[in-house]
Structure formats: C-alpha cells, structure tokens
Regions:
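Conserved cytosolic headpiece of P-type ATPases
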Residues: 1-167
Length: 167
C-alpha cells in the first residue's frame, strides 16, 4: 500500500496534504476514499498508528508528512486518538535514514502486529505478500514492477511517496 502527499506549500508553509492512495492495485484520489472498503480503512488506520504526529484542536505537532495523514483521517471522521487508544503502541523503531523506515508494534485482534512505514523500494525488499481485490496472496515480481512503476509515476508528478506494510 502506498500513500502520496502533495508537495505544494511544503516550502512556503511547511504543510502537506495527502493527494492519492494506491491500494489493492488501484490509484485512488483522496476525494474518492471509501472507508467502508476494508483495504482502504486498513491503510488509513495503519497510517495513524505508525505515526508520531498529532492535531489537537487545530494545533499540528510533528512532521508535515505525518500530520497530513492525521489530517486526512480527521477529514473522514476518524479521530487519531481513538484509533491509537484502541490499538496502543507497545514498541517502536523510530525512523532511521539508514533503514529508510519507521516501525511500530501494536496488539491488534489478539496478535502482535508490526506496522512499517517507509521508502517504497526498501519495503518492497521486505514484502512477501500483497493485498489485492481478491484478498491476500504471495507478491509476485510483476506486482513489484507495477508498484515500482506507480511509485515512479507519483514521483514524476512531484508527490512524496510512502509505503506501508505489516507483519
């Protein structure tokens, strides 16, 4: 799963917004985000959990990219605090420029779940399965190429790209 953030306003206001999602093999503009779709809701929840920023009463604290994810959730009626209370963080590996990723550990549905956010190329190296409209299956080389092509397309449009995965 991939999330893209528009860089417009980044330099002048240090503010970002999420423009598109790439979920289950489809590019989805945020205006068409459907939280009744399990894959889209899953990605939204995980983008809140693997995130250190907050937006309390309009006061944004944290990295602009992470804040954009929290703001998108809020625009769709999801309170980050509620999701975080439901699945508290039990551990973390902060973002590291060598690893090019951040990892958080949560107890979800009675299981330990490590959520990882980071660079598409780095996460693809670690990914063994993919969520498609047909469910979860082994990721193929063709899947990886399609994701890499979408990543390149987003980058050519000036979008910052983040990938999410879990174990």
């Amino acid at each position: 799963s991939i999330i893209c953030s528009d860089k417009t306003g980044t330099l002048t206001q240090n503010k970002m917004t999420v423009e598109d999602y790439y979920v289950a093999g489809k590019r989805i503009p945020v205006s068409e985000l459907d939280l009744d779709d399990p894959a889209q809701r899953f990605l939204m929840d995980y983008s809140i959990l693997c995130n250190d920023s907050t937006n309390e009463n309009g006061v944004e604290i944290g990295d602009p990219t992470e804040t954009a994810l929290i703001n998108l959730a809020s625009q769709h009626g999801l309170a980050a605090a509620s999701i975080r209370n439901l699945y508290p963080r039990e551990g973390e590996l902060p973002f590291d420029s060598d690893r090019k990723m951040m990892s958080t550990l949560h107890r979800i549905d009675g299981k330990n779940r490590m959520i990882v956010k980071g660079a598409v190329d780095r996460l693809l190296e670690l990914t063994e399965q993919i969520w498609t409209h047909d469910g979860i299956r082994e990721i193929t080389e063709a899947d990886k190429i399609k994701i890499q092509q979408q990543n390149q397309s987003f980058s050519m449009e000036g979008l910052r790209v983040l990938a999410f995965t879990y174990r």
